[in-house]
Design a protein with these regions (language model features):
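Extended hydrophobic-aromatic, low-complexity segments
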Residues: 79-80, 99-103, 123-124, 139-140
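Active-site catalytic pocket residues across diverse enzymes, especially alpha/beta-hydrolases
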Residues: 4, 27, 115-119
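Active-site/ligand-binding loops adjacent to catalytic centers
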Residues: 5-9, 13-100, 144-177
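Catalytic phosphate/nucleotide-handling subdomain of diverse soluble enzymes
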Residues: 107-174
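Short glycine/serine/threonine-rich phosphate/pyrophosphate-binding segments
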Residues: 1, 23, 104-112
């Protein structure tokens, strides 16, 4: 049927913000398992990228039904965009659509632009691009903003009991206030 033909043609194309690209590296290596990523380097790389939401150290990549399986099932591809590419794409979107977008959307748009330029997208392809964060700059124009610091920062490998105790203490504190 026509509906099943459309479904068969769907291809998942995802991106990461360089230099924080652990899923991209695993995908390029053909690995379901995330590759080793030294903690200090991972932290440093995550600090460099604009799209902080793309800096998950333990994403649902290799789990059954996770991103690896979804990419495999759709013949998908993984792309990388630098901060400069993403900023350029965000600027282009604002010029063409009149609204600002989040950094992660800029990474996705930059990857799409690069994929089109490289001939990886057919000219008659139907493309769905997930764009988030439209209008934040406009929203902030006449608002007073407060930048809050976290109440607690856990180590990379926290003790489960410590996490539970700290979270319970946060809720107890908020309830008492």
């Amino acid at each position: 049927s026509a509906a099943s033909d459309v479904y068969k043609r769907q291809k998942l194309m995802v991106s990461q913000n360089a230099p924080f690209v652990p899923m991209y590296d695993a995908w390029q290596a053909g690995s379901r398992k995330m590759l080793a990523y030294e903690d200090d380097k991972a932290r440093r790389d995550a600090e460099i990228i604009d799209a902080k939401v793309l800096s998950n150290r333990r994403p649902p990549y290799g789990i059954t039904g996770g991103l690896y399986d979804a990419l495999k099932a759709t013949g998908g591809e993984f792309f990388v965009a630098t901060n400069a590419m993403a900023r350029k794409a965000r600027k282009l979107f604002k010029e063409l659509e009149g609204v600002d977008i989040y950094s992660a959307s800029g990474v996705a748009l930059a990857s799409l632009v690069n994929a089109v330029a490289a001939g990886k997208i057919e000219k008659d392809a139907v493309v769905m691009l997930n764009i988030t964060g439209g209008g934040e700059e406009h929203f902030k124009e006449d608002k007073e903003l407060w930048y809050l610091k976290p109440s607690h920062v856990f180590p990379l490998e926290p003790d489960t009991d410590d996490v539970v105790a700290k979270v319970e203490a946060l809720f107890a504190k908020n309830i008492a206030e």
